[in-house]
From Swiss-Prot:
Annotated compartments: Secreted
Lineage: Eukaryota, Metazoa, Ecdysozoa, Arthropoda, Chelicerata
Keywords, alphabetical: Amidation, Calcium channel impairing toxin, Disulfide bond, Ion channel impairing toxin, Knottin, Neurotoxin, Pharmaceutical, Secreted, Toxin, Voltage-gated calcium channel impairing toxin, Voltage-gated sodium channel impairing toxin
Family: Belongs to the neurotoxin 10 (Hwtx-1) family. 04 (CcoTx1) subfamily.
Stated consequence of mutating residue 27 to N: Important increase in potency toward Nav1.7/SCN9A, and low potency on Nav1.4/SCN4A and Nav1.5/SCN5A; synthetic variant D1Z/M5I/R27Na
Primary location: secreted
Source species of the chain: Ceratogyrus marshalli
Name of protein: Beta-theraphotoxin-Cm1a
Amino acid sequence: DCLGWFKSCDPKNDKCCKNYTCSRRDRWCKYDL
């Protein structure tokens, strides 16, 4: 199961969905342009 938009995440263990990335600053999944 992956994390979607605006879900809180850990930058060291990025479990965001495909095309998303865990923001180190905000600590939630953002769309990776």
